[in-house]
Amino acid sequence: MGKEKKTESYNNDSGSYNYRMFKFYNRKFKINEVTPTDDVRDAFCQFAVGGGGGGTDGDSSDGDGSTGVMGAEQLCSFLDDHGESTTVAEAQRLIDEVIRRRHHVTRFTRHGLDLDDFFNFLFYDDLNPPITPHVHQDMTAPLSHYFIYTGHNSYLTGNQLSSDCSEVPVIKALQRGVRVIELDLWPNSTGTDINVLHGRTLTTPVPLMKCLKSIRDYAFSSSPYPVIITLEDHLTPDLQAKVAEMATQIFGQMLYYPESDSLLEFPSPASLLHRIIISTKPPKEYLESRNPIVKQKDNNVSPSSEDETPRTEEIQTLESMLFDQDFESKSDSDQEDEEASEDQKPAYKRLITIHAGKPKGTVKEEMKVVVDKVRRLSLSEQELDRTCSSNSQDVVRFTQRNLLRIYPKGTRFNSSNYKPLIGWTHGAQMIAFNMQGYGKSLWLMHGMFRANGGCGYVKKPNFLMKKGFHDEVFDPRKKLPVKETLKVKVYMGDGWRMDFSHTHFDAYSPPDFYTKMFIVGVPADNAKKKTKIIEDNWYPIWDEEFSFPLTVPELALLRIEVREYDMSEKDDFGGQTCLPVAELRPGIRSVPLYDKKGEKMKSVRLLMRFIFE
């Protein structure tokens, strides 16, 4: 695919593109000059000196902004008017940066922004981003008060059945800001070491040592807040002890040790800066789970599974690999071996900060809040759906103190993902996603965790943590009054001409772009809108405004997608993004777009305005 040379200016000299029609005929399309919109021009005129609005010196000359200049004080006033508290020095830094990019000169030869400079400033997404780019939420509450960026089978490079296992996806996830890494631990072929792989499949293993070293090296490459390693271990006590030894040696001071076997309350992200914590089932619970027949007789319940295949199959495989080798009969010597292994378990058990489990009885029973300890419970997406339909209040109450992890259903062999909002709206902290399962659900995940500076922890709204006089809690299905209305104006887009060849979207003419917008949140807030199609233009100017009434804006996401209209085939993809509504910065903003994998596109941006009423 050919690339056009990128220019940093959005006010380019006019040119043209030639498209070959039939065999001998060339069709020429003029490239229109990109100019400031009326709203941009009005904003400049209002604040610039000599811009017609008076600026700070009362000059109100021609009113079109063409001769005005916006200095540091005027830019500071503009930013203050947009709800941003800034200093004159910071405003001057922004002016200097715009002038450097556009004119390659210093402020000693240019002292302020003209209209085109101001227009370009608004279109630079690093200088004028749509959401707050730094951590701004309280990070001192217990972990259960946060949505946490969570991966599922973090070591897989592709599908759930036959892809390679590798440390590379773990590294990529950490670099993106994921804070919960899942590793499935199995004995190697000789039973003397530990591999990471998706059991009972054709996935190729990767040594645990590689994964742990990668976590150590990249854990805090994008965020200083704690990394949680969830272990699904299928190991003998001897190998569990080896895991403890590996983790201790590799992580060193990074590894967090809980002060007691059971916590009354989880520690806070702020108290765990640059720490790695472990979450798994305690060894005793694991040993019991390896002989579910006995447990079933005792409890008259069937075990549940977090894995993608039935639990009975897992048990059969585990028994053939481990149980039959070491615990086939209960002779005296076997009992002695088990007692000897107790000497090794404490080292492994001591690592576990977040005790995990799966429902042994009904989910309703498992979700009863225990006063003297906190824990993590794992449910499949189907179990969550059923539980939220019948006992949604129990889910919200449980997640006020405990951690709830949701994982994909077993039929998602292609590593696709589910809709995350049902979990978030019920307070579930760990919505475990396949980070290689590209698509709209993963775009929502990316969007949620752009919040709070992209640190991987997003504070849950206060209403999810409160109880009423009669122990009632938030119900996402309850119809509530509109709290505020979000008005979104889509001015224009640019950057495709720089990132794509001129025939990428259409071999015979420039592209026909349109923008779709979706609100995804509680059921009452879900909505979608679409702009008109702008034909044959690399610089689409829509200049359309849409209103979204919101009952629970704190849990709403704004998903944006640009498509290129195709009369005969499926419309082409032109970029996407997803933004947390609660994080949107009011005013005119530059909104960068991302590709289907969630990677930021080099040049493609939209100019938009957000207003809350």
From Swiss-Prot:
Q: Where is the C2 domain?
A: 466-595
**Cellular location(s):** Cell membrane
Region Disordered, annotated ranges? 288-349
* Enzymatic reactions: a 1,2-diacyl-sn-glycero-3-phospho-(1D-myo-inositol-4,5-bisphosphate) + H2O = 1D-myo-inositol 1,4,5-trisphosphate + a 1,2-diacyl-sn-glycerol + H(+)
Entry cofactors: Ca(2+)
Q: What does UniProt note about where in the body, tissue by tissue, this protein is expressed? A: Expressed in leaves, flowers and siliques, but not in roots.
Q: Which residues form the PI-PLC X-box domain?
A: 137-281
Give its E.C. classification number.
3.1.4.11
**Catalytic residues, chain numbering:** H152, H198
- Which keywords annotate this record? Cell membrane, Hydrolase, Lipid degradation, Lipid metabolism, Membrane, Transducer
* Pfam families (UniProt xref): C2 (PF00168), PI-PLC-X (PF00388), PI-PLC-Y (PF00387)
**What membrane topology term does the record carry?**
Peripheral membrane protein
Where does the protein principally reside? Answer: membrane
Role according to the record:
The production of the second messenger molecules diacylglycerol (DAG) and inositol 1,4,5-trisphosphate (IP3) is mediated by activated phosphatidylinositol-specific phospholipase C enzymes.
The protein's matches in PANTHER family, at most eight in alphabetical order, are given as: PHOSPHOINOSITIDE PHOSPHOLIPASE C 6, PHOSPHOINOSITIDE-SPECIFIC PHOSPHOLIPASE C FAMILY PROTEIN
Identification of the protein by name: Phosphoinositide phospholipase C 6
State the organism of origin: Arabidopsis thaliana
